[in-house]
Every structure is written in structure tokens, then in C-alpha cells.
Amino acid sequence: MNPSTPSLLYTSIFFYFTIIATQTLSLDPKFKACEPKSCGKGPQISYPFYLSGKQESFCGYPSFELTCDDEEKLPVLGISGEEYVIKNISYLTQSFQVVNSKASHDPCPRPLNNLTLHRTPFFVNPSHINFTILYNCSDHLLEDFRTYPLTCARNTSLLRSFGVFDRKKLGKEKQIASMSCQKLVDVPVLASNESDVMGMTYVEILKRGFVLNWTANSCFRCITSGGRCGTDQQEFVCLCPDGPKLHDTCTNGKNDKRRRVIVKVLIGASAAVVGLIAASIFWYVYHRRKTKSYRNSSALLPRNISSDPSAKSFDIEKAEELLVGVHIFSYEELEEATNNFDPSKELGDGGFGTVYYGKLKDGRSVAVKRLYDNNFKRAEQFRNEVEILTGLRHPNLVALFGCSSKQSRDLLLVYEYVANGTLADHLHGPQANPSSLPWSIRLKIAVETASALKYLHASKIIHRDVKSNNILLDQNFNVKVADFGLSRLFPMDKTHVSTAPQGTPGYVDPDYHLCYQLSNKSDVYSFAVVLMELISSLPAVDITRPRQEINLSNMAVVKIQNHELRDMVDPSLGFDTDTRVRQTVIAVAELAFQCLQSDKDLRPCMSHVQDTLTRIQNNGFGSEMDVVDVNKSGPLVAQSPDSVIVKWDSK
């Protein structure tokens, strides 16, 4: 290769990314000003809310102005003389949970004002009951009222303060109560009936808070067109990277059509430049490896892959280090365990090899992966799985028992055997049985899978092939996440790595597919597809469905935004008959919607996803999610590839 070639490549790359950086720096100031913010904890704040001191007032409406609670690091909303701490925000239901700030900070909270929502865009969600607090009441007031005494107040022998839920009785005696007490304050409490708060104290009841809904212009079309919502003299505008639009999207009108044509031309030209650069780099690297391979020995690898192209890049010293501490099985031992790799013992196959059931001499049941002879990447995949799994210990990750020796005829990996098949088998495969997989079990599977992925990301590992076929289940439906052949160890100081898209159709992150940038948010997107599988029992890709529903992720987004989630929920889950199931399914769907955003920066991290699912599992309510509008518009702009005309294995 000509010595000047690397310099030419670096110069080309420099100019290409200089152009990209220039485009980024030219973003409209209002667009940049309305980037979502938070107070440190709790939900991120964006339209129709805005965070005073951190965002401009044109990022939301005046009635939605929030401040930060310095102690709790949560957003605060002022209504009718009281301050309310916002615990979470849900745009799926256009609602947010609030708690009176006195209940958050004061050991003896005493709200002094009735909640008045007249001339505000807010209204109390029906999921509440009214709690009336009676302050400083004379001792002769009916004893029946004294259900929840305010014991922390300065009661005397003549005056008492307490709360009551019995609105009917209080209604009859309202005049008596108003005459006998100095003040009556009505407080809504999140509960369907009094039995929900049975056994709680006065303070615990107030700390439950309540849910408010709001009305505001839809932001969905603006978000999915790449914009951010805001206001101009209290009128809705879509704030786009190139300037505000008076309509609700960044892609409307003749000028936008012309701009899209220009963008397509620029993208095409950029793609050509990148393609040329990539081809040159590939040729250069290939030439270097080819030259180096003559100097390297392939003795470490099994004899029948010494001519394997991937073997030439398989670092011998690192491979020897890799096998330290890993149990080495002989080929004969595994051949006997699998009855000479009997086809009847096949458990499944993937892009790299076939998995067989085996039984070792010590009685252990194992799963043996035999990598395909004709797959030139098998040595790389072999090393990848060994390198990753030997350093991991988590109850929801499949365990690697060992591998074949360097003198083995084949590359073999030995895993713990997980007896109950895959999640895909139970949802829409040969083991599908609605009665065996109720919603509580599905939610448990979601929590455990998220826990495993959170652990991987904390270990700087991206799975890159999260799907229901790679989620194994034992007899108690405990999760074991498997198949790390595509996984990547992530550099500690990087937010993404550039690599050719790999994965399974229907699960691949569209941002990764479009930009060739792999990040941990790619796993978040794939996991969201699994969440929708758990809700619907439908496969990620099905070419027999209508065109717009072939891809489950696209189908889910459309159904949620059109308030048609019920249409895709598995009827066996009891969505229409069980209130808790309905609440938790909606909360999980909302979380999945957030994770399916085409822009990876709008997705939560896996730690947030796992924490949210745990909260949903424990108390049935939603999460501290970013605000996302799902009211009026079409599907997200990008979606995971769903083409199955040409077989696309996980490679």
C-alpha cells in the first residue's frame, strides 16, 4: 500500500467530520435551549412543562412552570397556594403524580388550602378518594369522625384535629363540622377506596399523594420529526434544528420537501464518501493482516480452522491468557456427552453454531454449542463468548462451564443447561400456553432480564442481540440471558463505538442501523421490543400481518399513540377484568414506548429501565419517565429493519 494512503484517509475523515460538526454547531438556539432537563432526581422536564432557571419560558406554558426542590432534587409545581413535589410524569396518560411538599418535609404535615384547579389546565385523576382534614375541632364533635387522628398536632383536652374519608357522613354533618372546627381542608389521595389505605397513619396517607391530568397541544409529531416543542406568546410551536415552525412538525410544506431532497442528496454523497473511506480502510487492514498472518503461528487453534481467515486475527498470546481459569473439555468427552452430536439432541441453532443437549460423566446436564465449520467468524465468536462470560457472575446470565481444548477438532462451548426453553417458545412458539405465563410471571421475566442487562452495561458490555430467543427460562421461569457471540466490550471513555450493524430483524436499533454507532441504548431498544412481546404474545416480525404492523415495534408505537393499546394486549392477561394488570401493563407499555424512540438520546438507560420495572412490579404505578407525547400522530420516523426476504442471521 502506498505510504501516503493512511494520510489521505485521515485527511478525508477529518474533513468529513468537520462538516458534521459544523452542522451540529449551527443548531437553532431555541432548539438547544429546550433540551430536556432535570432537578437531579425524578423525571426529565420538557414541554408542556419547563424548569425555571434551567430552561427558557418558551419551552412550555406559563401554568406548567416548575422549580427545583433543593432538598429532594425533585421538580415542584405551585397550585392554589400550596407547593406539590412531582414524583413522576407519564405522557401516555397525560398525568403526573404529586405529593404536597409539606408531606415530604414536615413530620407533621398540615395542608391549609383546598386544591382549586379552576382556570388551570389540570384536573384530578379519577383514581382518588377525598380525605378531609378537620383542624382544632371541639371535643363534642361526633366520635365517628375521628378515624385518623392528627396525633402530631398540639391537641388539647378541648380541641382535636383529625382526618376522615367518610364523605357521605361528613356531608350530612357538614354544618356541624364547620361550626365545631376552625378549618376544613379537602385533600385528594391516590386510592380506589378506603381499604387501600387501611392501617396507614395520617402522615402515611398524605405521602401517597395523588395524580393530576393535564390538557395541552400534542407534541408527538414534532418530536418524531426531530423537533422539540415550545410556545410563542402561549401558542404552540415546533422548535426544529433549523428554526421554529408554526405547524406541528419539522417536515411540512414545499420548502421542507425541497430541504428533504437536499438532505437526501447530502446523505447520499456522504454515504459515498464514507463508503470509499471504509473500503480503503478495509483494504489497508486486510493487507496488513495478510502480511502479518505469515509471521504468526496458528498452533493454539483447533487443527481444522488453521486456514480460517478469522484465525489470522486471533491473538495467540491473548487466547492463552483467556483459557487460564476456564475448564477445558476434550473433544471426546463432549462427543460422548452429546451421543456423537446426535441430531435428536439439538436444542437450537443461531448464526454461529448448533446447540446440543449433553450429559457429562459427573451427571451434570449441559448445553454444548458447536460452531459451524463454514463460518469464517467462528474463532472470533468463540473468543468473544469466552472472554466475556469468564468475567461475569449474575444469577440471570447463563453460566459458561468451559470450552474445548486448543487441540480439539472443533470449537465447542459448554454452558449450564436451562431446561424450560426460551421466552419466544412460551410466548408464540411450540410451548405457548396462556395459563402457564400469567402477567405476574411476564413482569418478573422483564425485571430479571433488565437486571441482567443493567449488570452487563455496568460491566461495559453491550449484548447486541437482545431478543426473546436469547432469554432462557428454567422450570420456575427464572431468566438466563444467553448468546454473547455478538457482544462487545465497551471502551471505558466512549459513549459509542462505530461498527457495522449486526443483530436480528425487528430488534435492531434503528439509530445503530442508520448511523453505524453502537451504544448501550441499542440494547435498550431491543429490550423494549421484548417488553411488547410480553404484553402482546406476538413475534417481533411477522410478514403475515398488515404492512404497517409487520414490525412489532412500529405496531406498538402506533397503537399506543392512538390509545389502542388494548387491541394488542394478549387477551389471556386479564387487561379488561383486573385493575392491577391493566395499570401495570399500561405502565410497562409506556416504558417500552420511551425505549423505542428512534433518537437514542431520548431513551432511558438500562439502570433506569430496571428500576422502573421494579417499581411497577412492587406498587403497580409507573415511573419517573421522560415526557413523551403519544396523542395524535403517526409512527416513529425510524424503525428496526424487518426484511426477511433474505435470511439475516445473528452474526
From Swiss-Prot:
Q: Which residues form the signal peptide?
A: 1-26
Q: What is its EC number?
A: 2.7.11.1
Q: Which GO terms describe its cellular component?
A: plasma membrane
Q: Which residues are glycosylated?
A: 88, 114, 130, 136, 155, 193, 213
Kindly identify the residues recorded as the active site: 465
Q: Which residues form a coiled coil?
A: none
Transmembrane domains' residue ranges: 265-285
What keywords would UniProt list here?
A: ATP-binding, Cell membrane, Glycoprotein, Kinase, Membrane, Nucleotide-binding, Phosphoprotein, Receptor, Serine/threonine-protein kinase, Signal, Transferase, Transmembrane, Transmembrane helix
Q: InterPro entries per the record?
A: Kinase-like_dom_sf (IPR011009), Prot_kinase_dom (IPR000719), Protein_kinase_ATP_BS (IPR017441), Ser-Thr/Tyr_kinase_cat_dom (IPR001245), Ser/Thr_kinase_AS (IPR008271), WAK_assoc_C (IPR032872), WAK_GUB (IPR025287)
Q: What happens when the gene is disrupted?
A: ABA-insensitive and drought stress-semsitive. Late flowering.
Q: What is this protein called?
A: LEAF RUST 10 DISEASE-RESISTANCE LOCUS RECEPTOR-LIKE PROTEIN KINASE-like 1.2
Question: By which gene is this protein encoded?
Answer: LRK10L-1.2
